[in-house]
UniProtKB/Swiss-Prot annotation:
Required for rescue of stalled ribosomes mediated by trans-translation. Binds to transfer-messenger RNA (tmRNA), required for stable association of tmRNA with ribosomes. tmRNA and SmpB together mimic tRNA shape, replacing the anticodon stem-loop with SmpB. tmRNA is encoded by the ssrA gene; the 2 termini fold to resemble tRNA(Ala) and it encodes a 'tag peptide', a short internal open reading frame. During trans-translation Ala-aminoacylated tmRNA acts like a tRNA, entering the A-site of stalled ribosomes, displacing the stalled mRNA. PANTHER family: SSRA-BINDING PROTEIN, TMRNA-BINDING COMPONENT OF TRANS-TRANSLATION TAGGING COMPLEX. GO terms for cellular component: cytosol. Belongs to the SmpB family. This is SsrA-binding protein. InterPro entries: SmpB, SsrA-bd_prot, SsrA-bd_prot_CS. It holds the Pfam family SmpB.
Amino acid sequence: MKSKKSKSTNNTIALNKKARHDYILQDKIEAGIELQGWEVKSIRSGKVNLSDSYVTLHKGEAFLVGSTIQPLNQASSHVVCEPLRQRKLLLNKRELDKLIGSVERQGYSILATAMYWKKNWVKVEIYLGKGKHEHDKRDAVKDRDWARDKERMMKHKV
């Protein structure tokens, strides 16, 4: 019998942690991403940065903007590597229509929060979100501190 390969539990490539702090995230959508060969090699080695990345809509298509994929040192010399290029996201028509409607009518932003492996494909987790005001951010910090203090008090009581 063949033994099965052990699957790694962590398929995450990159995270955008600042998005949760700066935006109220609501609807999650999983999107495929169109990549070039050198980009896949760089992603496998973990040279990806998603901070300050967002999604723009142009002519009925979605593009990931602001993400950085650094080329490897041994990349081919005949291929021009653009670390900051726009990358097309692969979405269904229904998902695109939902995104277009939310952005145009309701003033939402589309943010990339994570990049991960799903089988052999690179997927991007995108969210519809509204920007937080400064007082919303302070309230979130206050709530988080209170929850931590409450846990600490309950732990010492028992």
